[in-house]
Amino acid sequence: MCSTPTYCDLGKAAKDVFNKGYGFGMVKIDLKTKSCSGVEFSTSGHAYTDTGKASGNLETKYKVCNYGLIFTQKWNTDNTLGTEISWENKLAEGLKLTVDTIFVPNTGKKSGKLKASYRRDCFSVGSKVDIDFSGPTIYGWAVLAFEGWLAGYQMSFDTAKSKLCQNNFALGYKAEDFQLHTHVNDGTEFGGSIYQRVNEKIETSINLAWTAGSNNTRFGIAAKYRLDCRTSLSAKVNNASLIGLGYTQSLRPGVKLTLSALVDGKNFNAGGHKVGLGFELEA
C-alpha cells in the first residue's frame, strides 16, 4: 500500500531540489549513531559565518516495536527541553497518535501539542491541538488521492479569538517521474511548482509564487545532477538574480561533505556573497 502524502508533503520533491544540498552562510555538522540497546542519537550544531552565533541540539529516540511506541527527547542550546511520545499502527493501520511537550527551565514556560493522523492509499487526514490555557489553536488537514491526482485542504482555528487563521487549498498531480503542485493560501497567496526527473542522474524543478495586490512575483529554477553514486552537483537561480551552487561528496560510507555558495548576481562586485560547509556523519 502506498500511503497518501500529508498536506505539508505535497510538492515535496520540488522543494527538496531547491533546499537539499545547500547551507549558505554557515558551518554545520550532523551526527547520527545508534547504541547496542537500540537508542538512536542525533546531534547537530551550526555556526553562522556573518554573526558568529552558534547553536546546537541533541535528540534521542527509542522504539518499542512490539507496542508501536516511539519515545523521543530533545534538547537545544536555547535550553529548551522536549518530549514526544508516538503510538503508531496499533489501533488501526496508518493511524498515528502523538503527544508532544516542551519545557523551558529558565522561564518555567510549558506547552504541549496533541497530534493525530490517519493515512491510507486514497486519503490522509490529520489534526493538531496546541494546548494553551488562554484557548487552544486547532489545526486540521485532509488530502484525497485518485489516479495520481491530489487535492488537499489545510486550516487552523484560534478558539480564544473564535477566528479562522489559516485557510489553504492545494491541487496537484503525481507520476513516477513528474509532479505538479499548485496552492492558494488564505485566498491571497498563489503558488505552484513542477518537478521532473529527466533520467537517473538529472532532476529539475521550477517554482512560482505571487501575492494578490502585489507586483512581486517570485520565480526560481533548480537542478540536481548526480555525477556518480557518491557525488552530486546542485544549482538554482531566482528572479532576484540570487545564484546558489552546491557540491555534495560521500567521502566514505557514513561520511558526507557539502560545500555551497550563494552569489548575488546583481551586485557581484559589491561582495556580500555567502559560502557554507557541512559534514554529515553516521555510524
Curated annotation (Swiss-Prot):
Residues the record lists as binding NAD(+): L242, I243, G244, S260, A261, L262, V263, D264
Keyword Thylakoid listed: no
Record-listed Phosphoserine modification sites: S241
Expression (tissue specificity): Isoform 1 is widely expressed with strong expression in atrium and ascitic tumor, lower levels in brain and very low levels in liver and kidney. Isoform 2 is also widely expressed with highest levels in brain but no expression in kidney. Also expressed in flagella of epididymal sperm.
InterPro entries, alphabetized: Porin_dom_sf (IPR023614), Porin_Euk (IPR001925), Porin_Euk/Tom40 (IPR027246)
Single GO BP term: behavioral fear response
Sorted UniProt keywords: Acetylation, Ion transport, Isopeptide bond, Membrane, Mitochondrion, Mitochondrion outer membrane, NAD, Nucleotide-binding, Phosphoprotein, Porin, Transmembrane, Transmembrane beta strand, Transport, Ubl conjugation
The protein's role, per its UniProt record: Non-selective voltage-gated ion channel that mediates the transport of anions and cations through the mitochondrion outer membrane and plasma membrane. Forms a high-conducting channel with a stable open state and a voltage-induced closure with a mild preference for anions over cations. Involved in male fertility and sperm mitochondrial sheath formation.
Modified residues (Phosphothreonine): T4, T33
Pfam family, one: Porin_3
Location in or out of the cell: Mitochondrion outer membrane; Membrane
Modification sites for N6-acetyllysine: K12, K15, K20, K90, K266
Catalytic activity as recorded in UniProt: chloride(in) = chloride(out); K(+)(in) = K(+)(out)
Full protein name: Non-selective voltage-gated ion channel VDAC3
Gene that specifies this protein: Vdac3
GO MF annotation, one: voltage-gated monoatomic ion channel activity
